Amino acid sequence: HLLPQSSLWQGATLLGEIAWNRRLSITKNAAALDPNTTRDATAIRVVFEPQYFQVLDGVDISVPIGLGYTIDGRSGAVGAFGPEHGGDFSVGVKGDFMKVWRFSFGLTHYFGSAGPIAAGGIQTFKQIYRDRDFLSFAATRTF
């Protein structure tokens, strides 16, 4: 969704997604299903990105802010759906100079109860990236 100009930004976008899945039935080999999964699982992801134009001569920037969270359930239908009651938060700065040079800097933080992907052959649905927060930087040039 494009947001109109305000006193806090010159332009902005707001994106959102709700994901839900349900396992309807199991026709064969039901014993192979992980007993820690649930029939339903629900998650959300939201990204808000205010934009600022001509901050310096020829420089436009934006500040993407994102949040992903598994609201409910432990998906038996989608393998990497997310940790139960966990997710990630990210914030960054993106910019361009004269629409030729583009740069970005970001921080991603993972939250939720930490744990391994599986214990005793059963998925834990814990946050396996809890200790993997990271910074990223990229620069590109068009020609």
Task: Pin down the residues of each PLM region.
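Residues on the lipid-exposed face of transmembrane beta-strands in outer-membrane beta-barrel proteins
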Residues: 1, 46-52, 65-67, 91-95, ...
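Short loop/turn motifs that connect adjacent beta-strands in outer-membrane beta-barrel proteins
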Residues: 1-14, 53-62, 95-100
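Long, well-ordered mid-to-C-terminal structural blocks that present hydrophobic/aromatic surfaces
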Residues: 1-35
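Transmembrane beta-strands of outer-membrane beta-barrel pores
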Residues: 18-24, 50-54, 67-73, 107-113, ...
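Extracellular loop and loop/strand-boundary signature of outer-membrane beta-barrel proteins
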Residues: 31-36, 74-80, 116-127
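Residues that define the transmembrane beta-barrel architecture of outer-membrane proteins
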Residues: 38-44, 83-89, 131-135
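C-terminal beta-signal and adjacent terminal beta-strands/loops
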Residues: 97-100, 108-122
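Outer-membrane beta-barrel "beta-signal"
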Residues: 100, 129-143
